[in-house]
Amino acid sequence: MDSSTWSPATTATTEPLKPHERIRNAADISVIVIYFVVVMAVGLWAMCSTNRGTVGGFFLAGRSMVWWPVGASLFASNIGSGHFVGLAGTGAAAGIATGGFEWNALIWVVVLGWLFVPIYIKAGVVTMPEYLRKRFGGKRIQVYLSILSLMLYIFTKISADIFSGAIFITLALGLDLYLAIFLLLAITGLYTITGGLAAVIYTDTLQTAIMLVGSFILTGFAFHEVGGYDAFMEKYMNAIPTVISDGNITIKKECYTPRADSFHIFRDPLKGDLPWPGLTFGLSILALWYWCTDQVIVQRCLSAKNMSHVKAGCVMCGYFKLLPMFVIVMPGMISRVLYTEKIACTVPSECEKYCGTKVGCSNIAYPTLVVELMPNGLRGLMLSVMLASLMSSLTSIFNSASTLFTMDVYTKIRKRASEKELMIAGRLFILVLIGISIAWVPIVQSAQSGQLFDYIQSVTSYLGPPIAAVFLLAIFCKRVNEEGAFWGLVIGCMIGLARMITEFAYGTGSCVEPSNCPTIICGVHYLYFAIILFVISIIIVLVVSLFTKPIPDVHLYRLCWSLRNSKEERIDLDAEEEDIQEAPEETIEIEVPEEKKGCFRRTYDLFCGLDQQKGPKMTKEEEAAMKLKMTDTSEKPLWRTVVNINGIILLTVAVFCHAYFA
């Protein structure tokens, strides 16, 4: 069967929003409704059965989570709808190399669980900027990093997820774009606001199962349709569109033919679209930032009940990260084989006809596969998968962003805020994030360029390396001080912003219409730029630190690797300020009799976790015991051995996969 003339693709691509492409049958609608009912039921169960009335309960799930929901939540938080659209789209356009982004994580989840999380737990922190404040003292690094992280969440993570989710919804349902996005964000925000981190982790666990089952089913259908793996490799290399000219314009051959190295991860260091030194070292820097210092990821690990559960969750996530190559990237490539004219289009007028944008339609590879290939019922399941990935990713971002705002920004504005006030502030900030997200949709929509995955990774390459450098040195080099860390962050981010603003001002371009950005600025691949920026940031941090006063060890016990097992009492650099903040205004709340609350008010308080049923006030000994539990990193010898062996196996699997597909 000639892939380029396959009849369903031909009939379906002329009008993406025809009724026969939309989900209008009872089977699909029933599956979607059942999915939403189950997700809301799980969220409500978590709301009723977990402690959400304290900052520790809402933001860290009371440090009570076991390993398997932690691992599932790590995976679901990472795999958003941007992966289904971006990974599959880049796979359709350029082959399997983009799967290397997923496999690189196998190494860094081990680094996270074994090296970074023990320090964070011993430090007794809730957020990553809070760790830097304890490590270096002062407020400017904490506030600077919090605001930078919130900007990154809004303009990369949230915008990318909403954009990619919108592509799928528009293609499959034909609903009004803004109505669909508003409903998704409303439901997402609802169980994030009401349930806290426990609800997020439990719903993530459910949605991980949905994603994996649905993705495996679609992968089976796709490989069956294409004729197996060997036929897939052969047909992909011949998946060339027939329309390659428009009037006097003839597209260059390299713009529409599959790459000769499509089935290799490691590519030419100078001419490759993902050069192997960049994929090996540059990507590792981005992974260090994302997996070891990003609030969304680390917060899941901090919620685990002990270190063995942290490590087991990281290993579980690592094994899950093996799958996207086979259930997202390769199905995206198969979509190019089955619907070549649509997915591999290069002539601007043809692309605009198929997907509404002139630069290419690779982003719709996975959604097209779902709409065209899946039977009734299963198509609804796959829509649920996309909704699950979108919502789980957004809930993770909303919860972690509200944590950052509440603990690192709001407490600087309201130093004596009560526990209840902090809880309300965190929930209201989620509403603000939802509002900004909806307002950002038209900008993302107008910037549709077919370069979604590259856009996300390039922005990360420009802003992430200085943060990665500061955290790495903060933990493994105790000589680094506040001045070095601050100026390393500021100068590094200024360099990254200069490159980013220049590149986006000129436009990233495409194969058909290359960018006019000067080679000296934009000619360096973004993964190579990440390496350069990381090295510059490290040099600045070290040089400034060596020429300024060091931090005494008494302030660093259990905050850096060399002093991680110290038993001495640590004097925090901002201890006096913390003493002031630890005096919440609780006396006002005690004066309000519980009986005077009406039925509506009691229901509202229960719904939002603001009931705060007060038990007896904790004694000094009980507070010390609670603090000891929250900062305990001890492990039982048997389980420590089990997770260590699994960590070694995971690293071995990572090396094998890279070598096999090199």
UniProtKB/Swiss-Prot annotation:
Q: Which residues lie on this side of the membrane: Cytoplasmic?
A: 48-66, 118-139, 194-202, 296-309, 407-422, 478-481, 548-642
Q: Which regions of this chain are Extracellular-facing, per the record's topological domains?
A: 1-24, 91-95, 170-176, 222-275, 332-375, 445-451, 505-525, 661-662
Where in the sequence is Phosphothreonine found? 587
UniProt GO BP:
intestinal D-glucose absorption; renal D-glucose absorption; sodium ion transport
**Which residues span the membrane?**
25-47, 67-90, 96-117, 140-169, 177-193, 203-221, 276-295, 310-331, 376-406, 423-444, 452-477, 482-504, 526-547, 643-660
The UniProt entry lists the main location of this chain as membrane
- Which UniProt keywords are present, listed alphabetically? Cell membrane, Disulfide bond, Glycoprotein, Ion transport, Membrane, Phosphoprotein, Sodium, Sodium transport, Sugar transport, Symport, Transmembrane, Transmembrane helix, Transport
A GO molecular-function annotation = galactose:sodium symporter activity
Recorded domain comment = The cholesterol-binding site is formed by transmembrane helices TM1, TM7 and TM13.
NCBIfam families for this protein? sss
Q: Which family does it belong to?
A: Belongs to the sodium:solute symporter (SSF) (TC 2.A.21) family.
- Spell out the protein name for this chain: Sodium/glucose cotransporter 1
The organism of origin for this protein: Sus scrofa (Pig)
What gene does this protein come from?
SLC5A1
